[in-house]
Amino acid sequence: MIETDKLTPAVDRTNLDRVVAPQTKSAQEEALERALRPKRLADYTGQVKIREQLEIFIQAARNRSESLDHVLLFGPPGLGKTTLAHIVAAEMGVNLRQTSGPVLERAGDLAAILTNLEPHDVLFIDEIHRLSPVVEEILYPALEDFQIDIMIGEGPAARSVKLDLPPFTLVGATTRAGMLTNPLRDRFGIVARLEFYTAEELKSIVSRSASLLNAPIDPEGSFEIAKRSRGTPRIANRLLRRVRDYAEVKADGNITRQVADAALHMLDVDPAGLDIMDRKLLSAIIDKFGGGPVGVDNIAAAIGEARDTIEDVLEPYLIQQGYLQRTLRGRIATPAIYRHLGLAEPASAVVRDLLAEE
């Protein structure tokens, strides 16, 4: 059984408008993700080392009739942290209770969840880096000793009562592991970083999802979607659904490479997975600032986006792919993006390369 405490996230218009955004866009998309989500480790594609480790740790815990050690999953959004939490609970044969760091505002919120857990249950806390210090303090003894201290009464009559908890497994997920406090991080026995997926791994995911959606697709069509999915299963599944729509209306319903290419071209997703916002940022650096170096505030003014949006939403993938470089003097367009856009690299690039090395 799965119980979920809902959190309504702040609306990020830039992400809502981007088909290649790694964040979940709506409740409807969350429901579709759940339908496509693998239920067992045997069905989980990618993250080979993590999968192998979890298979061993879960089997060992089950053999000893113990709860699994607490698990911390971190990495960029859309890579399968929530999916793995659900799989851990399914493989252990226990219930999963799901909540989110920002939802747990008071110590009582966490205490209410912990005291209702059954032995060996899995508690999944998404965005665990956003736990308040007060809640985090309550969590420490719960993780170590399976006990919590709660205050009863107020003022001089207040007293502390220690409550025993059933053994349970906390699975924490975060996109910002660096924001976790050391005491909290140290209480996780299993720590795993999720990496971006290869195109071949995403091809398998697209093929599996297409089968579940009853969408006919050939291997070349799967690969065309996969290679534009920015290494992220969530994006791959979203693109698949949009390509399926295109195939049903503009073609015969079968997703071939040509159909996928035409659909993704319509969506402004190029062969490298860049969308119109990515190209807008890179074009501004190249056309308006000579390829850089240029400060992020100047870029923000040039393209009409907030600084935080550029740093948190647009830049990470461009930097990871080697199209953009951050230096002390500002952002620089790399030779790779000139090649991708079919532009001649200016002679000043040599000077910029020297600046980038400083």
From Swiss-Prot:
Keyword Protease belongs to the record: no
Top-level taxon of origin: Bacteria
Location in or out of the cell: Cytoplasm
Binding site for Mg(2+): T82
E.C. number: 3.6.4.-
Residues that, per the record, bind DNA: R307, R326, R331
InterPro entries assigned to the protein according to its UniProt record, in alphabetical order: AAA+_ATPase (IPR003593), AAA_lid_4 (IPR041445), CbxX/CfxQ (IPR000641), DNA_helicase_Holl-junc_RuvB (IPR004605), P-loop_NTPase (IPR027417), RuvB-like_N (IPR008824), RuvB_C (IPR008823), WH-like_DNA-bd_sf (IPR036388)
Function: The RuvA-RuvB-RuvC complex processes Holliday junction (HJ) DNA during genetic recombination and DNA repair, while the RuvA-RuvB complex plays an important role in the rescue of blocked DNA replication forks via replication fork reversal (RFR). RuvA specifically binds to HJ cruciform DNA, conferring on it an open structure. The RuvB hexamer acts as an ATP-dependent pump, pulling dsDNA into and through the RuvAB complex. RuvB forms 2 homohexamers on either side of HJ DNA bound by 1 or 2 RuvA tetramers; 4 subunits per hexamer contact DNA at a time.
Family annotation (PANTHER family): HOLLIDAY JUNCTION BRANCH MIGRATION COMPLEX SUBUNIT RUVB, PTHR42848
Positions of region (Small ATPAse domain (RuvB-S)): 198-268
Catalytic activity annotation: ATP + H2O = ADP + phosphate + H(+)
Stretches for region Large ATPase domain (RuvB-L): 4-197
Name listed for the protein in its UniProt record: Holliday junction branch migration complex subunit RuvB
Span of the signal peptide: none
Any one Gene Ontology molecular-function term assigned to this protein's record: four-way junction DNA binding
Keywords: ATP-binding, Cytoplasm, DNA damage, DNA recombination, DNA repair, DNA-binding, Hydrolase, Nucleotide-binding
Subunit comment: Homohexamer. Forms an RuvA(8)-RuvB(12)-Holliday junction (HJ) complex. HJ DNA is sandwiched between 2 RuvA tetramers; dsDNA enters through RuvA and exits via RuvB. An RuvB hexamer assembles on each DNA strand where it exits the tetramer. Each RuvB hexamer is contacted by two RuvA subunits (via domain III) on 2 adjacent RuvB subunits; this complex drives branch migration. In the full resolvosome a probable DNA-RuvA(4)-RuvB(12)-RuvC(2) complex forms which resolves the HJ.
UniProt region (Head domain (RuvB-H)), positions on chain: 271-358
